[in-house]
A protein has these predicted regions:
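Short N-terminal edge-element motif at the start of the domain
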Residues: 72-143
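Short beta-strand-centered aromatic/proline hotspots
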Residues: 145-157
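Contiguous surface segments at macromolecular interaction interfaces
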Residues: 1-76, 158-304
């Protein structure tokens, strides 16, 4: 089947996860949402200097999280700043959501969402060429807002329900396996016939055509200065502001893709944000039982 080289506008749900009265958000069993998170990470400022500090950013983490700070609700701004928490390996249960894309640890990863249909047919998202650019974001107030920029590097690993454990074990962390791969292949809606692609994101130190993956962020020193709306990206040749779900793929040659990437960088920076290039992976931490659905009798557990 034909490979895809170019830019993908990828729409995923943009709503913010709620936080319970005790400050916790349980592992998600419902629709994917975003979280406004604080972790130790790395970012590049406008002068191209790399900083290591606490950062705040919008992203996906469907595992448990703990509130760090809260604000009065305002349109498009986050209501809660949360810290992602890794409780250790999950237990198999229907509906357990996976984290995809994944921006924590040594590499960004993307491996499931919209790559296949329930009947086993795969989409063009399994056939991305190295150097392709994925702009993950959401449609809010009739505009496309960005949370993750993913530059596909040349380490692409195909996998399916029969092969994933062997094919991917050497290339992913235990945390990624637990919060993304295990829930993915526990999901009965993921076809046995479909072969997915595990993509890794090009990093600052291993750029692809001078491009690297990043997420818009700010340093977190003062809660009132770290809060931000997701940046609007307006590039008519590749962005459709009317797109409410799904993806738009625009085939481009590598030089054109790089030009789009540069425009995205400029627009993110012009909205007062920095380029987050790394987020420390959450280490195993104790959590209350009520944030783990398999300890609450929710859904249906089954043997692996």
């Amino acid at each position: 089947m034909k490979k895809f080289q170019g830019v993908v506008q990828f729409i995923h749900p943009g709503g913010e996860h709620k936080v319970d009265s005790d400050g916790w958000t349980p592992w998600n069993l419902t629709m994917h949402k975003r979280k406004f998170m604080s972790v130790t990470g790395s970012y590049i400022d406008r002068s191209e200097r790399v900083h290591n500090s606490l950062i705040a950013f919008w992203g996906e983490w469907e595992g448990p999280s703990k509130r760090v700070h809260s604000w009065t609700a305002e349109p498009q701004l986050p209501t809660n700043l949360v810290a992602p928490v890794f409780p250790g390996a999950a237990s198999r249960i229907d509906g357990l959501q996976n984290t995809d894309p994944y921006v924590f640890g040594n590499k960004f990863h993307y491996t499931l969402c919209k790559q296949s249909r329930r009947d086993g047919r795969t989409t063009f998202l399994t056939r991305l060429e190295p150097g392709s650019l994925i702009l993950f974001g959401s449609r809010l107030q009739e505009q496309f807002v960005l949370d993750t920029v993913f530059v596909v590097d040349d380490n692409i690993i195909p996998h399916n329900r029969l092969t994933w454990n062997e094919e991917l074990s050497a290339d992913v962390s235990e945390t990624f396996r637990s919060v993304t791969l295990d829930p993915m292949y526990w999901d009965k809606n993921v076809s046995d016939e479909a072969t997915h692609s595990l993509y890794s994101g090009a990093h600052l130190d291993s750029r692809f055509h001078s491009m690297f993956s990043f997420f818009p962020c700010l340093p977190y020193t003062d809660p009132e200065r770290a809060r931000f709306v997701r940046p609007v990206i307006d590039i008519p040749s590749v962005i459709n502001h009317k797109l409410q779900q799904g993806q738009k793929g625009t085939e481009l040659v590598p030089e054109q893709t790089k030009e789009i990437w540069l425009q995205v960088v400029e627009q993110v920076r012009n909205q007062g944000l920095h380029l987050g290039i790394g987020a420390v992976e959450p280490s195993i931490s104790a959590v209350p039982d009520h944030v783990l659905p398999w300890k609450q009798g929710m859904g249906h557990t089954s043997e692996s």
